Amino acid sequence: MELKVTTLEGKEAGSVQLSDAIFGLEPRQDIVQRCVIWQLAKRQAGTHKAKGRAEIWRTGKKMYKQKGTGGARHGSQRVPQFRGGGRAFGPVVRSHAIDLPKKVRALALRHALSAKAKGGGLIVIDKAELEAAKTKALVGAFSGLGLTNALIIDGAEVNNGFATAARNIPNIDVLPVQGINVYDIVRRRKLVLTKAALDALEARFK
């Protein structure tokens, strides 16, 4: 698959040949979905907690005698039916992470990249660099490229000026190539790769 390369100013800068093994797969939503669920489950903090009846600080003495009061038969005051009692089957601190094999994760990334390429949501630029970290200038460049909701992937290191200018623009994410992931690709309308990022991805999946 051949794709045009443009500059940030919207000028043509040649073309690039995309690998069919990375960008030419028939997208499978089930594999992509598995990876997204894995990512979102892994990022959950799992710090929610409610005290059970064994953790409530309250006397364990029987409330009143068993018979003769006309009231129901109660023992401990820590039980869930009383105000201030322990929660029955409440949430506990735990990890929400699930297992997903590395090969499936790598396959999901290739399917997400292929889906963007097939749907016309992939743009290749020569480099993502700015001389001055000015958000206004970058907004103008993005407007010329038609980018309002995009994930931009640079090489191993992101240009400081570019990252600083982009961080205040809504719906624009900038990541180094080692940070590329399925969830961020799926949640943004456009995927923008620099030539350095493209070379790194092809070396990674070689």
Curated annotation (Swiss-Prot):
One of its GO terms (molecular function) is structural constituent of ribosome. The keyword Transcription regulation does not apply. It holds the Pfam family Ribosomal_L4. Gene3D superfamilies: 3.40.1370.10. GO terms for biological process: translation. It comes from the Bacteria. Disulfide bonds: none annotated. InterPro entries: Ribosomal_uL4, Ribosomal_uL4-like, Ribosomal_uL4_dom_sf. Signal peptide: none annotated. GO terms for cellular component: ribonucleoprotein complex; ribosome. Part of the 50S ribosomal subunit. One of the primary rRNA binding proteins, this protein initially binds near the 5'-end of the 23S rRNA. It is important during the early stages of 50S assembly. It makes multiple contacts with different domains of the 23S rRNA in the assembled 50S subunit and ribosome. Forms part of the polypeptide exit tunnel. Belongs to the universal ribosomal protein uL4 family. This is Large ribosomal subunit protein uL4. It comes from Rhodopseudomonas palustris (strain BisB5).
